[in-house]
Amino acid sequence: MPATNQGWPEDFGFQLGGSGPCFVIEVAEGSSAHAGGLRPGDQILEVEGLAVGGLSRERIVRLARRCPRVPPSLGVLPGPEGGPTALTAAWLTRRFGRSLPLSRELLRLAGGPRPDAVHRERRRKAQEFSCQVDDILGDRLTAKEQVFTALKQFAAEQRVDELVWTLTLVLPSEAQGPVLDNLRIFIPKKHRARFDEVVSQGLLGKLCRARRAQGAQRLRRSRSEERPERLLVSTRASAAPRRPDEPPPRKATSLLGGRTGPGGPRRTVRVYKGNKSFGFTLRGHGPVWIESVLPGSPAENASLKSGDRILFLNGLDMRNCSHDKVVSMLQGSGAMPTLVVEEGPVPFASDSDSLDSPTRASALTSLQWVADILPSSIRVQGRTFSQQLDHLLTPPERYGVCRALERFFQHRNIDTLIVDVYPVLDTPAKQVLWQFLYQLLTYEEQELCQEKIACFLGYTAMTEPESSLDLEPESTPEPTPEPQPRSSLRASSMCRRSLRSQGLETSLSCGPGDCPEMPLPLIPGERQAGDGTSLPETPNPKMMSAVYAELESRLNSSFKGKIGTMSKSRASPPVPSLVGTSGPRTLSGVSWPSDRLLPSPCYDPLCSGGLASPSSSESHPYASLDSSRAPSPQPGLGSIHADSPPSPDPIRPPSRRKLFAFSRPVRSRDTDRFLDALSEQLGPRLSIVDDFLTPENDYEEMSFHDDQGSFVTNERSSASECVSSSEEGSSLTYSSISDHIPPPPLSPPPPPPLPFHDPKPSSRTSDGPRGPPQSLTKPLTQINHPVPPPPPPPLPPPVPCAPPMLSRGVGHRRSETSHMSVKRLRWEQVENSEGTIWGQLGEDSDYDKLSDMVKYLDLELHFGTQKPPKPVPGPEPFRKKEVVEILSHKKAYNTSILLAHLKLTPGELRQVLMSMEPRRLEPAHLAQLLLFAPDADEEQRYQAFREAPGRLSEPDQFVLQMLSVPEYKTRLRSLHFQATLQEKTEEIRGSLECLRQASLELKNSRKLAKILEFVLAMGNYLNDGQPKTNKTTGFKINFLTELNSTKTVDGKSTFLHILAKSLSQHFPELLGFAQDLPTVPLAAKVNQRALTGDLADLHDTVSEIQVACQSMAPSSEDRFAVVMASFLETAQPALRALDGLQREAMEELGKALAFFGEDSKATTSEAFFGIFSEFMSKFERALSDLQAGDGPRSSGMVSPLAW
């Protein structure tokens, strides 16, 4: 090899050509380039790590000759004639017609030769495979790219099923066989068995054909039809419309013994794994399924196969459990778990819609079944649920939504679902997904979810189907208004929700023909509130139905006989038509019979005719305690009450925007998370009020000045309802033109009215600027009735609204001013905080957030000095029917849970006990029935209720019926013994074998005997001073556990370390004595007394069953004697074998005890074997310390044994 690079590349035996990129033209045989692996056709990509793929030959030569390394390292792309990457790289070079970027695979050459034997064969196969793909697919470049993408994905993920699935979809059917056969050489050996199984059986092809046929034959209504293993626990709302002759959906309940769909046959298997692993791999989720089974494993011995779904484990339902939970349950299932599996093909997460993109990675994730849970027939805006998730959400957001749905399917908690999903669906476009989520709920959950969304978010049309709207088209044309700001509530959506509300009761009722229900057309430039793309920002009028109903009941009770006809016809209130006086803009809507506007009176408690106290706001949730006088309607235009005085000219308030305030619900983690997420979405337009509002006023809307635009005309602002706040700070102020919610009625004054005295104005300010009301064209009674009823008693003049002043902090007025007295903290204030930590806190803007947070810590409840008011005694609750309970509370509770889990009626369970065929009873069920069975005293008390079982509770009635079965407890014990005999015998046999084998190992171990002799010699030397005088002939073996307690003089070493060091120097063959005693540590864990007791219990149970068989005569109904007699005949040989093994084990144990000089009557097996187990572990630890060089040593001393 040359000493320098000046003659590169000719001196190294190869030549370059090309003007960018450059290729190896010729390589001399036997040269250093040939030995380094260069071949003709290789493309030069790197020189000493520098990218040279686009450089000419001359520049590459100059660069290489300046390199200090001889020869310079090259990064090349093998040509079509060689290299393991020829399969992919050669095709890609032809495909794109240019050199590959440096991120592709590179073959690094550093002077070492290439292996020829295996690589040459693989190169040849790769070339053949590449040519074969070219011949089969021809010019279909997309299909070629999918094939090689699948190969690359398999190289990264090693998923055989996905590789075969992709090739099955891409390649023609006649070409699949040859291509898969030639592809087998590239499959690693550990995956070839699975590859051969999938290819030979054609599982994926069958699955694909079955799914295509299934999708063409029927319209899928729910995911439960595709996944029969899922339990139907309640009624599901069908997404597709039903035919008129189709029966309504029926509520289905799960049965343990039944099947919910056309799944494969089920079978019960018992896996005898002992201390081994199961020997299978699991995949999937709810239920999990077996992907592969290892040959010779316990799973294969139990006849488990690939594709089996695990439905039950030891009687526990695993059909809806997650993958991690099933794995943890299997790990703790014991030595012989019982599985109920369902046969079927290997599940694969794909749908008919996914055939166009077979290599989608999301189709194989663990949560993909959530995205595919709705059938493809359910589409919104032309997309399915899965497609909308991919289109609208990012991968983290998709995972969050699917994870939230997964948790919801487990606990069925609507609140948690809303809290988890709402922060993700934060834009109008994303809120289309609510329409899909609505289809996954039961009918009861749909109503609850709709109510909660309306309560928290203020809209319902997002989740209501369009079919629920029953509106007639507008008959008369309306002038086209200008677009309104999107933040306001559309009049049409408000009217639709008002018309849909069946329970909305108001004090204003329209007579027949007076108030025709007409839809409001949408304003151009605005969206309908139910189109799935907008989020209304105003409260739902349905929420005010409770307020209207209460106020109307008070009004009707006071005016009984005068306006009784108003309650006959209850319809949704029409929306007044508002006409601007200073501009051409109008708002389309349902108009009153009159062309003029309705008033917007300002309600005040003084209108009731008396002086209101602070507590009088309870009688009217809309009442204001402001003592300022409210303006009356304009003179000459009528008013609500004839005797009301006129008001001055109205003052036009400035433009305002809405600020929403939500009263905090009951404190919980879910509500806190939801309100935090809500505040992040609505930002400064949300204020969380921590006062205890009544249910009638649990939603607040406050107004504030708009400094950033979104103005409305003064005429429109003057038409807003002016409702002042109460003393507690709860207010309901509608200040937008779009809030066409009629005001609640006035409470009638109690007769006779008190004289009114105008008080001085209060210092309190209202929540926002008040718009003066305008007048009525007619009295209100004339609007609703052709003939006006007698007028009510005259009212005192109302108090005018407060001046337009704004207090942004009114939302927290209750918590700041009217909280109870609390204990004071007796701290000493710092006079000068400048330069201290307290001065830094004052500069931190987070202190205001902490101050707001403190208000919700319920400090008044913990440190309050005022006693809470005593609860008012309410009406006596309805007394339930008295029942007699005989079982203890714990037994009754557990019996109820067991009955709900068994899904068996008392009659069915009685039939099982009489026939002695417990097909639906697991050993765990039988053990629980035995545990909760009544004792003798309880059985005696049950005799008094033989004639009147209805007086007993449900668990007691069940026990009473079970006591009618002859020898109830004996039958349960017999069935439990029959189900667990094999498991118990194997456990006892294993323990006895362990004792016998450990005894033989101790007696036959020559290494252990040599070590004991060495210890004896060392001890005699230390005890007597001379090795051959007055020596001890033996010692108790329990001294072996105390060897590490004898310290050396310096305290840095022990007798055990000296023993290990001496043995390693003079008898190294004795250091592995523990290998001759592998069973001793296991025998130390066997409890001899418990083992003997278990064997005695088996014989006692057999004797009891034999006596029961003799006492109970067989009959057509009672098969106890026949079944158990046959069982005992088969069980006797196993019991006799156990007895023989026990005698042999005890005999060997006694010999071992005598061999080591121990008393067989005073020493137990666990103590005897525990001594040797502890000695072995301590000796290994000491030896490890010495070998690691960190063991304690005696400095400056030479061991007397190191001769």
Curated annotation (Swiss-Prot):
- Specify the superkingdom: Eukaryota
Q: Which Pfam families match?
A: FH2, PDZ
Q: Look up keyword Methyltransferase and say if it applies.
A: no
Per the record, residues carrying Phosphoserine are 303, 572, 613, 644, 647
Q: How is it modified after translation?
A: Isoform 2 is palmitoylated. Palmitoylation of isoform 2 is necessary for the enhanced cell surface expression of GRID2, and is also responsible for the accumulation of isoform 2 within dendritic spines. Isoform 1 and isoform 2 are differentially localized, probably modulating GRID2 signaling in neurons.
Q: Which GO terms describe its biological process?
A: actin cytoskeleton organization; G protein-coupled glutamate receptor signaling pathway; long-term synaptic depression; regulation of postsynaptic cytosolic calcium ion concentration; regulation of postsynaptic membrane neurotransmitter receptor levels
Compositional bias, Pro residues, is annotated for 741-756, 786-803
Output the SUPFAM superfamilies linked to this UniProt entry.
Formin homology 2 domain (FH2 domain), PDZ domain-like
Note the subunit structure: Interacts with C-terminus of the glutamate receptor GRID2 via PDZ domain. Isoform 2 also interacts with Profilin-2/PFN2 and with the monocarboxylate transporter SLC16A7 via PDZ domain. The interaction of isoform 2 with GRID2 is dependent on GRID2 phosphorylation by PKA.
Task: Specify the protein name.
Answer: Delphilin
Q: What gene does this protein come from?
A: Grid2ip
